[in-house]
Amino acid sequence: VLEKFSGERFDNYVKNHILNPLGLYGGYCVDSLDKQKFVTLYEYNAKNSNHFSPSPAAYHPRRDEIKNYTLGYTTPIFSPTGGMKISATDLAKYMTMHMYKGSYKGTKIISKKSAKIMQTKLSDEENYGLALLQTTNLIEGKLMVGHTGSAYGLYSIMFFDPKEEFGIVAITNGCNPVYTKGFNDALRRTVNTLYNNLIMKK
């Protein structure tokens, strides 16, 4: 849909209309990024003597597929739901844009109306808006809004409290993916440790 109405390739649209305006370094097209900034991702395999295996496919180039790219059809090569390459610092800035209803440091990415729609859950069963989840299962007593990610051994979490205006981002890899109430236990502990020691004590 985005490519049809914008006429831009998905990765270029995200870079031109979101990343660059916010001053963020990242993207979906591996070939356009500095490989020196990539960190090796490791997949944890509990069934194989707790072995950690590198996941080189995470940075597989797409130059051959891009040569024959067709808008609206070839888009999945970028894994739009989880293929973004970005640092925790820049992901936190992106999160802050959502927390402030579409703007970050004077740069408007989406309207407040659109931001509210994205953050409003569509059903009580799933608690999801448009890619953003509402939950009280992450930090006790807090209604948090955000998103999690997992691919090639990487696990990430980006959640903010729209009322108290604080947010937490954490990215890790090579952990045993045990989940409780929908959240990776390692990331849940990390988020609560950061909250208890850096935010709640203020």
Per-region residue spans from a language model:
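Short, surface-exposed loop or secondary-structure junction motifs
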Residues: V1-V145
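Short intrinsically disordered coil segments
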Residues: A57, H147-S150, A186
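Solvent-exposed loop/turn segments at secondary-structure junctions
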Residues: M84-K85, H98, A151-G153, G174-P177
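A structural signal for short secondary-structure junctions
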Residues: D124-E126, N137-I139, S150-G153, F159-E164
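Glycine-centered structural positions embedded in regular secondary structure
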Residues: G129-A131, G167, G182-N184
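Glycine-enriched catalytic-core subsegment of oxygenase/oxidase enzymes
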Residues: L133, V145-G146, A151, V178
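Short, well-ordered beta-strand elements
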Residues: M144-H147, Y155-F159, E164-C175
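Short, gly/Ser/Thr-rich active-site loops of penicillin-recognizing serine hydrolases
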Residues: G174-K202
